[in-house]
Every structure is written in C-alpha cells, then in structure tokens.
Swiss-Prot record:
Keywords: Glycoprotein, Membrane, Nucleus, Signal, Transmembrane, Transmembrane helix. It comes from Mus musculus (Mouse). It is found in: Nucleus membrane; Nucleus, Nucleoplasm. The chain crosses the membrane at residues 1804-1824. Residues 1078-1150 form the BIG2 domain. Belongs to the NUP210 family. Residues 1-32 form the signal peptide. This is Nuclear pore membrane glycoprotein 210-like. SMART domains: BID_2. Glycans are attached at N80, N344, N808, N1441. PANTHER family: NUCLEAR PORE MEMBRANE GLYCOPROTEIN 210-LIKE (PTHR23019:SF1), NUCLEAR PORE MEMBRANE GLYCOPROTEIN GP210-RELATED (PTHR23019). The gene is Nup210l. InterPro entries: Big_2 (IPR003343), Ig_NUP210_4th (IPR056897), Ig_NUP210_6th (IPR056898), Ig_NUP210_9th (IPR056899), Invasin/intimin_cell_adhesion (IPR008964), NUP210-like (IPR045197), NUP210_Ig1 (IPR055096), NUP210_Ig15 (IPR055094). It comes from the Eukaryota.
Amino acid sequence: MIAFGAPRRRSFGLLFSLAPHLFFLFLIGTLANKLNVPQVLLPFSREPGRVPFLLEAQRGCYIWHSTHHDAVTIQPLYENGTSCSQRAVLVAESTQPIRLSSIILAREVVTDHELRCDVKVDVIDNIEIVSRTRELYVDDAPLELMVRALDSKGNTFSTLAGMVFEWSIAQDNESSREELSSKIRILKYSEAEYSPPDYIIEMEKQERQGDVILVSGMRTGAAVVKVRIYEPFYKKVAAALIRLLVLENIFLIPSHDTYLLVGAYIKYRVAKMVQGRMTEVNFPLEHYTLELQDHRLTNGGLPSKSVALLDEKTAMVTAVQLGQTNLVFVHKNVHMRSVSGLPNSTIYVVEPGFLGFSIHPGGRWSLEVGQVYVITVEVFDKSSTRVYISDNLKITFQFSKEYFEEQLSTSNGSYHVVKALKDGVVVINATLTSSLQERNSSQPKTYQISHQQEVKIYFPIQLKPSFLAFPHHPLGISNRFTVQVEGGSGNFTWSSSNETVAMVTTKGVVTAGQVRGNSTILARDVQNPSRSGDIKVYVMKLNKMELLPFQADVEIGQIIEVPIAMYHVNTETKEAIAFTDCSHLPLDLNSDKQGVFTLFKEGIQKPGAMHCSSVHIAATSPGHTLVTVSVTGHEEHAWSSATFAAYEPLKALNPVDVALVTWQSVKEMVFEGGPHPWILEPSRFFLELSMEKAEAIRVAEVRLPAKRKQNQYVYRVLCLELGEQVLTFRIGNHPGVLNPSPSVEKVQVRFICAHPASMLVTPMYKAPSGTQPCPLPQYNKQLIPVSSLRDSVLELAVFDQHGRKFDNFSSLMLEWKSSNETLAHFEDSKSVEMVARDDGSGQTRLHGHQILKVHQMKGTVLIGVNFAGYSGKKSPKGISNSPRSAGVELILVEDVTVQPENATIYNHPDVKEIFNLVEGSGYFLINSSEQDIVTITYREAESSVQLVPAHPGFLTLEVYDLCLAYLGPAVAQIRVSDIQELELDLIDKVEIGKTVLVVVRVLGSSKHPFRNKYFRNMEVRLQLASAIVTLRLMEDQDEYSENYMLRAVTVGQTTLVAIATDRMGKKFTSAPRHIEVFPPFRLIPEKMTLIATNMMQIMSEGGPQPQSIIHFSISNQTVAVVNRRGQVTGKSVGTAVLHGTIQTVNEDTGKVIVFSQDEVQIEVVQLQAVRILAAATRLVTATEMPVYVMGVTSTQTPFSFSNASPLLTFHWSMSKRDVLDLVPRHSEVFLQLPAENNFAMVVHTKAAGRTTIKVTVRSENSSSGQLEGNLLELSDEIQILVFEKLQLFYANCQPEQILMPMNSQLKLHTNREGAAFVSSRVLKCFPNSSVIEEDGGGLLRSGSIAGTAVLEVTSIEPFGVNQTTITGVQVAPVTYLRLSSYPKLYTAQGRTLSAFPLGMSLTFIVEFYNNIGEKFHTHNTRLYMALNRDDLLLIGPGNRNYTYMAQAVNKGVTVVGLWDQRHPGMADYIPVAVEHAIEPDTKLIFVGDVICFSTQLVNQHGEPGVWMISTNNIVQTDTATGVGVARNPGTATIFHNIPGVVKTFREVVVNASSRLTLSYDLKTYLTNTPNATAFKLFISTGRNVNLKGSCTPSQALAIEKVLLPETLMLCHVQFSNTLLDIPASKVFHIHSEFSVEKGVYVCLIKVRQESKELRQVLSVADTSVYGWATLVSERGKNGMQRILIPFIPGFYMNQSEFVLGHKDTGELRILGVERVLESLEVFHSSPFLAVSGYKHSMLTTGLTVYLVRIVNFTAFQQMSSPAFINVSCALTNQQEAVIVRAKDASGADHCEDSGVFKNFVGSYQILLFTLFAVLASTSFIFLAHNAFLNKVQTIPVVYVPTTGTTQPGSYTATCSPPHFLSSRPPLVQSRLQHWLWSIKH
C-alpha cells in the first residue's frame, strides 16, 4: 500500500503500482519530455543578469523553480500570450566569488512529471579562443572567433552571452607593429553579411564586444589576435592569443591529378580568386615558385633520372619515365613555407591500357543521317584512369567513307569532326601507335593499342501527319490520336510543349481538346535524345460541320456509315481548317421520325482521309426520316442533316419457290418488301411482274385494302393450261437528280398447273412448335388415335404424280364416309372447307378440312373420302388414272397424365426415379426444360419415363401426345438437388432422465426436403460429442425424415450433429445443436408463508443454464398474486399453488416448449402471535447475540412479514438497561434503522444480572388483515440471564482458551516458528480421546463429541532454552450465529444514516457462538443464504470464509436470511435498507437548472469525499464543491467517492426545457432616464425555480466564478410599437445573470448613454417593451414566450436658460407622455419668479407649456445667485433645472439676434433670400406642415428650439418663433422636414 502523503520514490516500484493506463501515460511522458541540457555552468559576474542561459523543455507546460534563489534565478518565458511555458532564462545572481550550485526543477502541470537541471556558478579561471581554422584567404569570407572560458577544474562554461570582452591585434614576433593592421582586421557583424546572436547585436549597438567576433584577411602574412575579459573583476585572468595566417587563394589549372604517357607533356596555368572572380597569373610568379618534388619510380626505373621534367618559365611538365611526382607551390618567403593551404598536383606517368570513344552532341552511338558529330578518342591506363593526350601522341582513326564524311581532324588523331551520310550499322576503329619524343630523341615510343565502336545511323525522325487539329469541347472531352513516326531507332520518348493543351503518352498517343491553344509534340529517340521530330497540335473552336455524300436507302438490318467533316472557320479570313480527328466528340443523332434508323453503338467513330469522324446508323424499320447529326453540349450549335430511307428485304412470301395448282384453280402470289417510293421524287417509283407464257395463265393485280401492309404486292394467277413457267417480280426507283443511284430489287418464282395423283387423310394436330409429327400417318394400315373427348378435324391433302402437294385443289369434287356413326359421324359429307395453312415448308397452301363428331366413347372407326371429278363443266384432257378414294382407320382414346406430378430427386448416380404415363395415344414426345440436369429414358413398352440425375437444378418434364389434338403437354415438376443442408429438430434442453424426439431432415435447394429413401445413398448418421445422452432409432413417421429418441443420462452439455456424404464424397454437417442436460428445476422455497400485503420473491435453482425466463402462474389469485420477477404478494388468507415453468417458443412451429417446471405451496396467514427468537437465554458478559421476531410456527420467519404494505413497526424495550444493550442491526457501522426495519436486534451483554426483553409489533391499519382478529399490535418478551465468565483470581494474566466446534480443524501458529523447533501435544481429553486430535505440527482436529482437552506447546530454542505453554481446548456445538456488516459509515456531526448509500459495496461477516455467547475460533458449518428479493442487492461469497460481498444497486429493503443447512433453526435475519445518500431529488431537472449536490457522508476524520460526474457536457460539475449546471438534455450519473469507505451515486435525468417562464416585479417598469435603476426580468427554465438543493457558500462561489450558468441564457428586448424606428438595443444594455438568492436567471436591463435627439424621440413614444430569453443549447427548438414590460419614457426639454425682461413671459416646453406630464412637479427657487399652470399644446401631442415671468424685475436683477426653475417627475425619477436670468439693457433692441432668427442670419445660405420670401413661405409651410403631420405622424416628435447667441439655451419670449418650428429635425421626422428648410447652428 502507498499511503497518502508519502514522498515520491524514484523507482520502478511506483511505476508498476500505478494503474495500467496511468503507467502508460507516465511512460510516454518520461520518454517524451526532456530538457535541452542536464547541467549548466554559469560564470560569476559583478554585473547581475549579464550572462543569461536559455533552458528549454520539450512538449508540455512547466512551472520552474530554483532551489537556490540567491545563486541562480529563473524567469519563465510565455509564448503567444498564453500561460504555458516551455522555456526559461537562467541568470547567475551570486554575489560571492565562490562556487555555488542550484537545482532547477521543471514540473509539468498536467502529469506532475519533474525535469531536473543542475546549475553551478563559478569564477572564470582562464579563457581561450576557439576557431574552425587558422588560415584565411585575402578578400575571402571572414572567420568567426569565439571565446571559451574554463573554471579552475577545466570545466567549460555553458555560455558567455552578455559578457564584455576586449579584442585586439597583438604583435607577432616575426612582424613589425606597423604591419599588424595591414594583414588582418576585426569586423563587426553589422559590417558583414552574417546573422549573429541577438545579444551580439545589442552589444554592438552599445559599442561593446562580446564573446564572438569576425576577422578578415587583408594581405598575406601572419597575425595574432588577443582577447581579454573587460570586467575589472577578471583583470588577473590572462588574455588568450591565436595566431592566424593570411594566404592568397591561388590554384593550378588543371587542378586535378594528371596522368601522362612517357614522352607526353602538359602545360600548367595559375589563377587566383579575387573577390569571387578568377584571374589568370602570368609566369614568373611574384611570391611563389613551382617545383617537382617527391619523385617515386615504379619497379625497373632509372634512379638517375627524374620521373618528369619541369620548365619553370612555361610551367610545362614532360614525362620521362614511369612513376609519380608532385608539382607543388613553394612560397618565396621562408617564414611562409609551412603553409599547408597552397595548391599542389600529383603527376602520374603510366603505361597506356586501352582506348575509348566519346561523341558529341548526344553522347550516344545512335546517329542521324545528315548531322555533324565530334568524335574524340580517349586513352586510359590499366586502372581505367583517363590519360592526358598531348600533341606528340599519334592515334590512327579509321571509318567507312560510305557512311561518314570527315570534315576536321587534329594532328594527333584524337579529335574528329564527321558527317553521317547514310543509315545502317558501321564500326569505327582507332589505334594508339606512338608518342614522339622531344629533346632530340630519335627513338619514338611505339604502342599498338586499338579499340572499335559500333555505330547505328538512322534516318531523321519525321512525324505524320504534318499537323493535328482537334476541336475544343467545353465539357473537357479529350481527343486521342496516334502519331505515326518514320525514321529513328523506333524507340522514342514523347513530350508536349504545352501539356495543358495536349498531352502525349509513351506510345505516341496524343490527347487534346480540353483547353484551346496549340502545342508542339516532340518525339526523342531513346538511343540518342538529341534526335527528335515534332508536329504542331491545334485545339480550336468548332463552328461548322457537314455530312458528306453517301448512299441514302438500304435494307432493314443493314448499316450505313455516314462520314462527317468538321471545321474551324476563321471569322476574319473565312478560311476553313478541317479537323484531323473529332471521333471522340459526342454526337447527338436526332430523327424527325423515331424508329426508322437508330444509332449503331457498336460502330466505331473513326476519322478518314476526307472526314474526321463518322456515325453508323442501322435501319430498323421501313420508312424515311430526316437525320440530324450535331455535337453534344458544344458552345456553338454545329449540325448537319440528310434524308435516309429504309425498306424491308424483297421476298416471295407465297409461294416461296414453286406454286402447284389443279386446273381452273387460282394461286394468290404475295411479294413483300423492296424499296419504297423515294420521298423527294415519288413519281420515279416502279414495280412489275413478268412471265414467260402469257397465254397459259391469267394475272390480275390485287389492290390491297388499307388495313393490309403497304409494302405487300399481291397477284392472282389463274391456271388456264397445264404446264410450268417462271414469273419475275421487280421493284425500285428510276434514277433522278435527287437520287442518282437508287436501289432496285427482284425475285423469281415457278408456277405449275397439273392433275392430282393421290390423296391423304390425317387427323389434324395442334402440335407444339419444334416437335416431330405423329408417326402414325406414315403407315396407312395402322390405327391412328384421336381423342374420344373432343371433336377432331380431319385434313385432306392432294399430291401430283411427283408427290408434290397442291397449293389449291378447290376445283375437285369430294365425298366423306364413316364406318360406325355411333362412335363418330360427319354433319355434311359432301362439302369440304378449304383452309390456307403453312405445312412447315414456309409456303401457304389450301387444305381440305372436315370435322369428325365424336360421342365420348372409346373404339375404332374407318373414315373414307372419294374423288368424283372437277366442278367445272369441262375437264382438261389427259386426266390420270390415279386412285379416286382414300381412307384412314381411327382409334378413340383419352388424354395422357404423368404420375407423380412433383418430385425432388437426390443427385446421385444410383438413384433411378420412375414416372408412369397413363392413357394417351401411346406415341409421346418426352421433353425437358433443362437438358443437362437428368438423363431421361423413355420406356415405351412400360409407358414410363426413367430419370437418372446428373446435375442439380430445376426442370419441368413435359410429355407431348404426338397423335392427339394438342391442348398442352402433361407436365411433372422435378427438382434435382445436391445436399444443401441437414436439419435437426429437437428440444435442446433436457432434464436428466427425460427423453425427447430428434427429427433429422435432409434439405435440398430451396429448403425442399428429400424423401428418406435417399438417406442410404447419403449415408446419413448422427454423431454425439459426449455420451451424456443416448440415441435410439425409431420407426419413420413420414417419408421425409428419420426419427430418433434421445434420453438424457448425465448432467452436462454436449453437441449433436447430423452428417451426410454426397456423391463426390463431400461431407455435410448440420448446424451443431448444443444439448444441455440440466438438473431438475426447483423453486425455492418449497413452501412460502406470508401475511397479507407482504411480498417475497421466489428463487430457483437447477434448470437450464443460463436460465431462461421463468413463467410464473398462481392457482388462486384471490389468495396471492405474482409478477414476472417471481415476487409473490399475499392478498387474503388461504392457500394457493404457484407454478414456475421454463419454456420457449419454437421458431419453426410456433409452439410453446416447456423445458421444466416446479411448484411452490403458498400459504397466506394472519399473525396470531409473535415470539422473540433468542438462541440462548444465558450469556456471559461482553458478548453479542442476535434476536429477531418470529411468528407462531417455524415457517413464519421475518421473510413472512418484514416487507408488508403498510409496514409493521417493531418496538423493543428492556426491564434493566445496565445488564445489556439492545441495539438495532448495523449499529456497528453507525446506521440507525427505522422501526419498520427493526424486526431483528443485537444483544450486547454488559454486566451480570437478569433482564426482560420485550417486543411490540404494531400494524397501522387493522383492516389490512395482517394481524389475526384485526388487532393493532402483538407483543412477546423473554428473560436473559447474564453472568460473569469464569476467570482466574489473578486477573492480569488471563489464560486463553481455544473454542472449536465439532468436526472442525484449526492450524495453530506461534511467534517462534522459524526461529526455534516448535512442537505440540494433547495432554488430556475429557470425556475421551476422540474429542480432539493433534498431528504434532500444530493442526488440531475436533471429533464428533463435545468435551475439553489440554494442549501443551513446546519451543526448543537453539540457544538451549525450552519454553512451554499450556492452553485449554473446548469442543462444543454451535448454538447461534450472527451477521455483522462492514465498513463503518461516518456522517457529518448531528446527522444520521437510516440506510446504506446506493452503490455502496459492503461486507457481511458471519460469527459463531456457543450456548453462553463465547465466540468460536474456527468454523465447520454449511451455511445457506436466502433473500426475500434479488433485485436490490447483488450478493455473493467473499474472498474469505464465512464472508459475503454485497453491492447496493437499487433502493429498497432486502431481508437477508442465513442459516445452517443441517440445523435450520440456527439462523439470523437482517434487514438491508438502501437509499439515496446524495441530495436533492433529481427527478425533475431541466436544462438550465443549477443543482447543489450534498451528502452527509464523511470519512473517519470528518472530511468529505470527491465529486465526479459521468458526462460533463450534460451536467457541468465542479468536482471540488459538488455543484452542477444542467447544460444539455440527457442522463448523467453523479458520484461521491470517499476513498476506502464508500462510493455512492445518483442518476440525473436532464429534460429539455419545455418553455421558459418570464416574470418581473409588477411594481417596477422600464424607463430611459440615465440614472434609472436596472430592471430585472426573472427567467425560469423549468416548472419552478432553477436552483435545486441548498447551496453552501463555497458552492455559491463556484456558481459565480466557475460554472457561470448565465452563459446558457440569451436575453432580448424589443419595442412593441413597430412604427418606432429605433432598435431597443440602442436604448438598453441587457445581460444575463443567475441569482443564487432567488434561484432563477435574471436579465438585467440598464439604460445606455443616449443622445439628445434619441431622448427627444423617446419622450413622446407610446410603446412598451417586449422581453424574452432563449437558451443557447436549445435555440429555436421551443416556442418563444415574450413578456410585455411597461415602458415610461423620461420627459424631455432642451431649454437650459431663460433671459427675460421685466415684461417678458417665457414658455417652458416639456415633451412627455401623458402620465409623465401629469406627474410633473414644476417649482421655482426665487420668490421673484412666477410659474403659471401648464397648458397642453393643441398642435403637438405630448407637449406641455409652462409660462415663466419675473414678478419683481428690479429685485431679481440685484440677486447675487442665479434663480432656477426645477422640473421633476416621480415616475421617471428625473430632476431638471432651468436657469433664469434678467435681460440687460443692451439686448432690448436686438430681438433678431436671438432664437431661430439669429440662426437664419448667421447662415450665409439664408441671407440669399429676402425677408419677404421667408415671411411668404412661412405661412404656407406652417399650414402644409401641420396638415402633413396630422396625416402621417403616429408618434409625435417635436423639437424644442434653442435660442440665444452668446449664452446657448437663452430664450427671449417676444422674439421667439413659433414652438413648432424645428431648427434640427429629429431622427424619425428628418425625412419629413428636410424639404422645409435646413438650419445650421
């Protein structure tokens, strides 16, 4: 445990003791937050604050603290005006030159995490100069020097910022003093282009030097810079020196290392950098010489020779032999030769390794025909390093003259300029042959190193087409065009100069059209990017399009491609530019006739040579239409139109090919389709039928009626002579101007006229399309079936000698006969109906039909037909001798049916399903709607169909009777399915020993079950997870399932699944059914005894787990009633049976399934008597024993009567109070239960004696039937004997005795275990040894009999001393037990608790006692706990034996009973009452309410706990005081937590404010006088006041300072008179407050400072003020209530002074409303003044005039003090005063200088008018003005003019203008008076 107030320990133990989330935050904070430095060393200074240091922390906000303020102070820095500090300034404040230290602590305000920095202050011991280099260049960037200070221990100071130093240039030992300033100088930062620290800038402004300076080199040489501390205290600290060298910035050209071949040479140049510019220096050099140094030879070199030779005059180096040497600068000044910054170069003399090529431009060996290139040959050594090629090297270069033309070549052969001539692949060669030696050497150095390079030459790149033009579309539709490329390597990179106009892909696809403009598309060769080709791309506006010539008529189904050209026409030049590609533009196709042509969407819009797009249209129906093509959504409407025609294909409908007729018969020939008359020239349409022999036939064109098709052409052809010929039909349009190439179609047929040769009679069948005909007519001698139920149509067909069927034989004479007219007959045997029918050949022929009438009888009949001759008068010659008759034998049968009609077949190869065909002709066609689902075998001999499944699916088996009249097939619906699902149906909760039925079904598709005959093919079986149940197969109940009987054997849970295997071996498993075998369901108690109105809850055990809902019912509801929770309430005396069932509803069947049930016997009684149950009546002192009230019988426990309504009250008393105390239960935790809960008490014995305990049980109402005989009270009493416990005489050494119950055990512990050897033994037992046993190790076991024993415990110490103690052990039975509660509850002084707080966790401890009240040290009792209800307490076993933990979850009283299961009489009952401990009641809380929460709970020290709220945005709560403001609707929970004692809560439901209630003090009103008090408008958001609970002073302060509830409320005011053009906000200032005293919101309305004009307007305003308020959170949600506040405006007068003569009378004009004017009080301060009564103005409403005059003018003039006229009003609390003065003599004749006329004269504008004009206008304006005001003025506004000159406000009565003239129009009336005149003061 970590105690409160314990110091923080910096260890990991603290981290792991935190909650996980706090530990995480702590860990994050520890890792993330740190200071910039851990330690700081500051210099001591006599000048405080001169050396600051900035301390920075990362993240968070910190509070800074210094532990040693006199040594180091710290000043936080706040950023952006916030209170958050992450930085602080350290300043050394030490005044003593000694080493001091301080610790800086930075504490993070949120996490309390501390950061530490150690700061030391010490004296500077020495200083030194720090520099990045010691060398400077002349006229180069300056060098920064910095001072570093160290203390005596060598530690470096953290900062020297702000300290003053003195920098100077000291004398060098090698230089004279006069040269010092010429070599180096010290710069200020302000003179250089560098940014110094801020403190340096400030110091330079004060002409001081800091710890950082700049130095700049002026000329070469050495210089010494010195620095010392300026402060006098450090005058003994030695100055620091640094020696700097100033050099020239010179370099060699080339400056890199050089590689030479033997004999080659190189010339060097020297340049220097001066002020950023490079200047070449001529030889010889002024200050330097060049030397070759450090010659290093390779193996085999001649030591006598150098590697290279140097010509100092020309700086040329010649390679002599292999090796390396250094070319270095040497300063001529000996003192400067140690300089390391002079340039040097290393020269390597090497052997050649190989050659290389380079080419320019492009650097690629992919060239272009016609281009000029520079080819360079490069030499490399064996290490691949490039060698310098001098002019004396010889390289031969070879190339093909066919491919290249050489234009330039150098002498050494390393540089060539060539031109590519033709394309192809060619190889160039180069060979290094020799190097010519100079210096008279005759032997050149020879080499033979060659290299070759393959070169690819391509033609120049050309892009096609030459340019691209695309239309711009405002919707951003892009065009895509692939550019064709010629030349180049074939691999290109593409780019666009303006990608906003055109973009190009890597494949050369150009996308453009979204933005107007032009761009250049560039294609670069990947092999050589310097080669490229380009085209221009234009995106222009489309403003013209046209459809190009095309074919205009076409057959239906054919497609016409219409080419479209689009243009951009220049508006100025009229030049038209055709677009390259506009195929991506969306085209809109419109026709004036819909459906003739449609857009062929599969057609590709593609550009062509003459057009940029095209549209494909398909002919869909005959007709003509005007097709208009336009661009969709374009900025200019571009369109073009053309006419198209579509026609059906020309064909011969009848006959299709050949027409065959008998002599004198007619064939009607029908042709259809072909072109229509061209709509623009219909006169050119033609059609014709031509023949070979005109005399053999007669042709007549048939004019079709209007209802026939218009494109059909019919001709009647009559046979005149026997024979055959060809007829040709042509149709089309002749060519014309408007249709130059029309379509013409033709078709041919043959016409035959012949004699009949044979006849055939067959029944007429309406066979379905696609089926074969009846096979019977093929055999003439076979019986042909016909229906015996319906009349049949017999058909006669006639054939010629070639077996061809005649189209028409109507000229023949026929006769019909029946052999058995009882079965069938003909009504007219000599006539025949000729019916045109297509017999399947596509040609319509005439057939002879005759109806055979049947009589619904089965049998056979012979039908015959005879041919008698032609119907004409004459017959043709040559009639054949063919048969003259035909016959057919018929059998009459019924229709076919299929059995069964529906079936579901399992998809398995071993399954064979048979379908029987009943009746019918016997000739059937078996068809299936699906072909691959089953294999169908038609067994003709058995008249059945066998189906073998092949694939799952649904099909319809159709049986067509081929030889009966077709009415439709006989069908069977068949479903072939695999196993889809296995279904188990059972009750999954089974009581042990019971049986349930298990039904197994196998489902196919669509949840259709299979028949159980397929189960053997499916290998269906059941599988159990465990053997707690058994299964037995039963007889099948139906053909679709298998049934099993399941028997529950053992309690537990198992899983049952059904398994099946399909044809592929795949296993299917049903959804596992979890089966629970549960113990028998039992209701507790078995018998319940109640008094009337008492409630007790039924508990249960056993049954399914988790337990389902128990349904309760009672047999007699007049005795008792039960609710759904099982709470039984007694009503009247009697018995009843309560039934409890666990049941559910089957989802499939909807039936109620009962898992288990039990019953309880309910007995409702009246209390006949009561008795006090005390387990013992003789007790020792200082013990406790519970007592409680019982009824007459043992079943009448406190459960029976403790929860009645009305409640019984229990009153206890004692005869002697000094013997024992009788206290209520839970008194140990300081609870004081009311009398209603005191059915149980605790006896505390105090002293020996005998006393009587009495209890009286009272009922409030005798009619409630609680007590027998309608008594109001019952009582009982018992005697208790208290005696002293046996003790030894020597009371200071009392031996302890161990008390154990029987059959228990106790482990003894001593204080010497582990330090000594401890053993124990039983010395003696009484009455025998079975009382107790001991194992020698301290474990005692009591037996089954009571008795006593003596126990000896011995300790053998290691130091040789033995200790022995002897104690007694008593084994006795347990007499009673007692429940006590924990923890203790504390309340404020003077307050008590009557119930446990809601939400509290409490512990019940069980203690056991013997028959005299002694407490047992161990226990062996099996306890049973019961509650009278389980909805108020959550209770369960504790973490220790014989303890119970409970949580108070709801208000109410729960009776807890506890008893020994073996001895039910040993029991204890306690009431547990739970109530709210937080006040006030929170049932009706509205938004805006302020709640002062309070509780009487405190801790043991009298301190309150901590308040918490679950949702702060609903109830904003101050956690310190417990006051909250309801800000939003919702539910929140307020918690009060006293750590270690109790945590309680209360739920707060905040309702939305239904309406705001406004009120005010009816005695108050609003006014606009400046000194008016604030008006208060009270607002309530709920039903009454908004303050809930009683507030403490601290809570009231929190409401005012922290919560600010007034921010919820917005106040508003508005004048009620809408004609008053003044907003109320200009007059009043309004804000909201919350009044804790009244408990409501207050709108304070105060008067603003007003102008005179505003006061004048308001003085006569007849208006009130509307006031209202709104909640910020619910603005606009609820209806707004407004309240009308009376408004009394203050009176107004603008006169402040009167100047009167002895005869003058002044008029005091006052504006105001009527009630104000009536309450005016006007009085004068001088007796020489007289004020007459007021009079109302007749012209202006609200104007009152008082007449003022001087009574004694002489005396008035002699007054020393001025006189006043005082005007006051009690309503508005106004007081105004007007000064009255006497006129002097000089002012008597100057009337015109005062008043309005003075203003007229003073204005230069008015002087332009004559006096006459003014006077003439005045009368007119007076009349007009008054008339106008009377009409429009609702609120009278009058301006009272001010007169006087030198004294503003003075007034002369005799010269004043009328009172209605206004010199300054008021605000409201200014628009009415501007047209009068304007007067300026």
